[in-house]
């Protein structure tokens, strides 16, 4: 779909002002190869209007010169990477904005990151296209995270600065959804629950094995001590001993055996692992995953049910966390974190007897809500962008400490670039996927009787 950015936001996304330039054929989404076949005719059409030409209008019957350029690419993350020529989020070099790799996903020092450059990406894409074998192309894309896309044929299009990170999928259905369902455990995915149960069982078995090994080791120490008590150690002439060596005795043997380190090592760890720079320590469940208590969850549900909200705001499910209410919609996540949770969460984690952990949970929630209010606003400034980065980096630092069972996801890294995007494009909700998803819903509800070529959608 094409939108006219010359129109103000309240008119820009109306159906009558939206041009549906094409519909991907069913039943499957195009892959990175076939997407180029769909983009080629679109890019050829856009290239014709790159040079100014005259168009007669009501106000200018003799014609007015216009130029058409397709600049910001707005899509969900999967489609965005395919269309812009970057690799998927599972790749080693998964980010379209910087050169961070998967093993650096927890890095919060954004000043140390090496950002991508549009011209460099275009050159890398040309090298990929000029490679003559599939093996060579695979090697190129693994080393750069870039492949060719038809949009590179547009000379003005910047693959880095003209790619917009979708506010809907990245933040609302990414960061907020992950915090609610995964970190807080409200409606946690069955796979995540099973993974935690498996890890907990593995930890219990490991602790049992270590305990048994420690008992056996203690028995061996006792047997060695009893056996050494019967040894007769003859004295040696004084001149045959090294100058700094103490005279051996049963006491020396006993004390050495009693001071033998008995701290157990995990059976999955090797002594040399600690000196391996690539070593990743095994996951520890000393602190169980966070879950709200039953009374806290009831308080949250009561707040959802009794809070007064505007008539145009849809109330989230009052049985939040129960699988029976189905999947939450994007606007429900936004309502929860901007209107409902700020009223009830402080009552759960703030008080004279609040523990240090609860204080950190509340501080983490504060940073998340502050970042959400900024990124969801329809106004933006450089100061707001900097404030967003402060709150978001603080939030990520806290979730790394409070929720060690759940590593960061690519979405968390992508959101680190929202500050720069706000400085470049302004308010991100004005360039979000909400409007495109609404049109998708309209198209999906159109009855074609499985004869798309004979329906009005072809005109």
Regions found by a protein language model. Give the residues of each.
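Core catalytic machinery and nucleic-acid-binding channels of phosphodiester-processing enzymes
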Residues: 1-10, 37, 327, 332
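Acidic, metal-ligating active-site segments
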Residues: 1-28, 100, 374
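Well-ordered, non-membrane alpha-helical segments in soluble/globular domains
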Residues: 35-43, 121, 125, 362, ...
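Generic, well-ordered alpha-helical scaffold segments in large soluble proteins
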Residues: 38-41, 45, 49, 98-101, ...
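Domain-level detector for long, ordered catalytic/regulatory cores in large eukaryotic signaling
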Residues: 39, 47-332, 454-459
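Amphipathic alpha-helical/coiled-coil segments positioned at domain termini
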Residues: 76-126, 317-380, 400-459
């Amino acid at each position: 779909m094409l939108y006219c950015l010359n129109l103000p936001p309240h008119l820009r996304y109306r159906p009558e002002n939206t041009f549906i330039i094409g519909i991907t054929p069913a039943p499957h989404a195009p892959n990175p190869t076939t997407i180029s076949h769909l983009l080629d005719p679109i890019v050829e059409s856009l290239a014709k209007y790159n040079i100014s030409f005259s168009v007669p209008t009501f106000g200018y019957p003799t014609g007015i010169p216009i130029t058409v350029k397709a600049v910001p690419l707005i899509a969900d993350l999967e489609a965005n990477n395919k269309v812009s020529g970057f690799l998927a989020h599972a790749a080693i070099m998964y980010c379209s904005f910087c050169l961070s790799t998967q093993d650096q996903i927890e890095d919060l020092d954004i000043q140390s990151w090496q950002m991508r450059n549009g011209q460099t990406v275009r050159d890398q894409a040309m090298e990929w296209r000029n490679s003559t074998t599939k093996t060579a192309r695979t090697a190129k894309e693994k080393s750069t995270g870039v492949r060719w896309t038809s949009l590179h044929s547009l000379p003005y299009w910047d693959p880095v600065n003209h790619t917009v990170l979708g506010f809907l999928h990245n933040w609302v259905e990414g960061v907020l959804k992950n915090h609610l369902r995964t970190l807080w455990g409200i409606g946690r995915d069955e796979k995540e629950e099973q993974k935690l149960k498996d890890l907990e069982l593995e930890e219990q078995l490991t602790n049992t094995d270590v305990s048994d090994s420690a008992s056996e080791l203690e028995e061996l120490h006792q047997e060695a001590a009893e056996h050494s008590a019967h040894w007769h150690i003859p004295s040696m002439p004084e001149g045959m001993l090294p100058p700094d060596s103490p005279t051996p005795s049963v006491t020396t043997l006993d004390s050495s055996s009693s001071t033998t380190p008995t701290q157990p090592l995990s059976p999955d760890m090797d002594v040399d692992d600690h000196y391996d720079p690539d070593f990743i320590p095994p996951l520890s469940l000393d602190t169980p995953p966070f879950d709200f208590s039953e009374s806290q969850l009831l308080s949250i549900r009561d707040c959802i049910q009794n809070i007064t909200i505007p008539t145009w705001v849809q109330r989230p499910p009052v049985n939040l966390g129960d699988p029976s209410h189905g999947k939450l919609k994007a606007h429900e996540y936004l309502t929860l974190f901007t209107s409902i949770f700020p009223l009830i969460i402080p009552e759960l984690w703030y008080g004279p007897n609040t523990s240090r952990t609860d204080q950190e949970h509340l501080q983490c929630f504060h940073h998340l809500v502050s970042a959400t209010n900024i990124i969801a606003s329809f106004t933006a400034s450089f100061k707001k962008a900097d404030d967003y980065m402060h709150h978001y980096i603080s939030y990520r630092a806290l979730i790394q400490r409070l929720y060690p069972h759940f590593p960061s996801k690519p979405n968390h890294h992508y959101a680190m670039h929202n500050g720069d995007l706000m400085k470049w494009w302004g308010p991100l909700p004005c360039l979000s996927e909400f409007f495109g998803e609404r049109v998708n819903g309209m198209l999906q509800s159109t009855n074609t009787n499985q004869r798309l070529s004979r329906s009005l959608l072809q005109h």
